[in-house]
Design a protein with these regions (language model features):
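Membrane-embedded alpha-helical bundles that constitute the cytochrome b-like, heme-associated redox core
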Residues: 1-235
Length: 235
């Protein structure tokens, strides 16, 4: 199994599989967030079910490992590609025909996404799962009853226009990263015939758009709600 680490193909395969697993997590996370739009009580029930329970902690650790593996392999492959190009990377050349902008800027997009994840961990994970782990039951935030009040935290966070703008920039970067990464991962694991090439790109764009819009709708909804005094009925 050493070829997974030592060979370029092996590294790409590991990065592709870890990326697809992270996309599955994003799908679950987005679906869970949308619950808050229909019932904050149901959303908080889901937050309470997850919380700091052993299965949620195991899942969180597994997710962290996937994320670290994906980042490390992305960094290694980027360095490998730059080394292979040598001094050519400093030459000013036209964009190759058929090469997406996202594919040429995956590392830059990845940096923005990582920064966004740290922001997200600060705003939510640290105030929810981590707070439960350390026994912090009072977050000291008006309108938020405790670590399992996920809806209250969403409402509080996205009432701040700075966070709204930062999250939307993050989601925009995520769209570009996923729209290329999704079909590229499928291509790497074997879906690489000519018939499916364009189909996969189309499917990836549609699926990525659904995920990103799902997250963005929650951000925008709660921001508008805050502008309307806490209820859309007052707008």
């Amino acid at each position: 199994m050493s070829w997974l680490i030592k060979s370029s193909i092996g590294r790409k395969l590991v990065m592709s599989i870890s990326g697809l697993a992270l996309i599955l997590f994003l799908t679950f996370h987005m679906s869970m967030n949308l619950v808050a739009l229909f019932s904050e009580e149901a959303y908080n029930a889901v937050c309470g079910f997850l919380g700091a329970n052993w299965y949620a902690l195991v899942a969180s650790m597994g997710l962290a490992v996937l994320f670290i593996v994906h980042i490390v392999y992305a960094f290694i492959l980027t360095l490998q590609n730059r080394k292979a190009r040598g001094n050519d990377r400093y030459d000013v050349v036209d964009k190759p025909k058929g090469v997406e902008w996202a594919s040429q800027n995956m590392m830059a997009l990845g940096v923005i996404i990582v920064l966004g994840i740290f922001l997200h961990l600060f705003n939510f994970w640290a105030k929810m799962q981590l707070a439960e782990i350390i026994g912090q039951h009072d977050l000291g935030i008006d309108g938020v009853t405790g670590p399992t009040d996920g809806a209250g935290l969403i409402r509080y966070t996205f009432s701040n226009p700075i966070f709204v703008v930062l999250y939307l920039i993050w989601l925009g970067s995520l769209w570009f990263h996923l729209s290329h990464g999704f079909w590229s991962s499928l291509h790497t694991i074997g879906f690489n015939n000519r018939v499916w090439f364009e189909r996969l790109r189309c499917i990836s764009n549609i699926y990525t758009t659904i995920i990103v819009l799902g997250f963005a709708v929650v951000v925008i909804y709660y921001f508008i709600q805050a502008l309307c005094g806490g209820s859309l009925w007052y707008c």
